[in-house]
């Protein structure tokens, strides 16, 4: 998915960003197995790679580092308020070592974990990054998810759903997104819609802003078959102007 966010100079308390994408971990190991006619290969390749975006702005880099650390380390990592880059490297190393150990114990086709970091753009006080996480631990294909970080540079925090739409207004947002989804599926004549009920439908916590509205991103399998990848549902500005926090309304 390609996202273009326009940079604007007014009301910014950070300069136009010069973002560097750094590879902080990249290890590949081959685990060899005794030859067997039952298998098509006699080895498994283990790949773990991690990227981190850096801006040169201390508070922003720490926020991005902590978020990446949480993505890689899981719930336990949330207890660490100020992880270092070395802490993140150790988490990648742990994933790599666990993959290798698992491959030695059980014959596998391979395993991989890739964390990619992308700078999407800046508009006034909103700075947007994304992380793509690709994992493969066996089977016909791996899994890819895209996670967004919309950072308010005034508040120095990553925005959550409750920041942009109050909880008591989210049922209206859900209705808007559900209508977009059903129209999308009907136009595509996609019978996958029968597998998702309105009661089971939720507002994705992954979103990004653009000139059309707020785009909510759902991972493969959540709303459509795997082959379609991420599904993006758009809440257009005119549909949500009465429920969105005015601070984050691009069309006010």
Residue ranges and their predicted role:
Residues 5-8:
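C-terminal motif of bacterial Sec signal peptides marking the signal peptidase cleavage site
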Residues 10-252:
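Compositionally biased intrinsically disordered regions enriched in Thr/Gly
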């Amino acid at each position: 998915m390609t996202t273009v966010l326009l940079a604007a100079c007014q009301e910014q308390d950070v300069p136009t960003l010069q973002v560097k994408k750094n590879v902080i971990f990249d290890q590949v190991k081959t685990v060899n197995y005794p030859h067997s006619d039952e298998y098509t290969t006699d080895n498994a390749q283990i790949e773990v790679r991690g990227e981190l975006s850096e801006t040169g702005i201390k508070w922003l880099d720490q926020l991005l580092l902590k978020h990446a650390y949480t993505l890689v380390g899981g719930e336990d990592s949330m207890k660490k308020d100020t992880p270092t880059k070395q802490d993140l490297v150790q988490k990648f190393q742990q994933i790599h070592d666990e993959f290798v150990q698992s491959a030695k114990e059980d014959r596998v086709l391979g395993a991989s974990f890739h964390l990619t970091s992308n700078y999407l753009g800046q508009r006034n006080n909103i700075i947007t990054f994304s992380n793509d996480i690709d994992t493969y631990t066996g089977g016909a294909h791996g899994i890819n998810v895209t996670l967004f970080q919309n950072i308010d540079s005034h508040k120095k925090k990553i925005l959550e759903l409750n920041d942009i739409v109050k909880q008591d207004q989210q049922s209206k947002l859900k209705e808007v997104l559900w209508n977009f989804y059903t129209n999308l599926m009907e136009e595509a004549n996609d019978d996958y819609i029968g597998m998702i009920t309105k009661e089971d439908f939720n507002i994705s916590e992954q979103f990004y802003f653009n000139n059309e509205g707020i785009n909510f991103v759902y991972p493969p399998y959540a709303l459509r078959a795997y082959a379609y990848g991420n599904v993006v549902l758009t809440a257009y500005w005119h549909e949500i102007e009465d429920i969105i926090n005015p601070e984050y309304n691009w069309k006010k």
